[in-house]
Amino acid sequence: MGDESYGLVIPNREVREVFRLQINEWFKRSIFSNAERLTTFWKALEEGNVENIEQYLNRILSNSISVFDTKRINGEKENSYHNLLVGILTGNAEWLVKSNIEAGEGFADIIVETDDPDAGIVIELKYVKSFNEMEQACQKALTQIHERHYQEYLLNDNRKDIRLCGIAFCKKRCKAMTEVLPVK
């Protein structure tokens, strides 16, 4: 086991063709599966399907990030999650995603103008130190949206079907709560 290196050669055209077809098929299945999950997540956000929102994000968190990615001073811990979520949302070419946008009486974490001109989503994120604080943090996020009137950004754009979403993160886990803004 020294510095020796070996070359690998595909022995003939038939074997090369089998490798090519299998690799292409694997890529197609992988891409389709990921795209399907992503589309399910976007739809879950639009519909307020908490179970699918959490399932997708928890899968991404467990497979994609390290707890070291979130090591920051306390006030900045949610930034990693914020950036991850903005990246996921901007993958939907039909949506206009706004990050840290001035809205109402403050700055909303994320506002999504969906492809439906009557609909939109306001998302507020929270980071907590322990898993048993997650539900309370989700409620706090929804309360913040209401108290600071972040939904006004979408209402001023004549969007009336507005979904509010509070998401709490703790290490590699998340919890979500959603509600529909009552129409006045």
Predicted features along the sequence, with ranges:
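Domain-level recognition of nuclease-like catalytic cores that cleave nucleotide substrates
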Residues: Y153, D157-K184
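Extended alpha-helical interface modules used as scaffolds for assembling large macromolecular complexes
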Residues: M1-H149, C174-K184
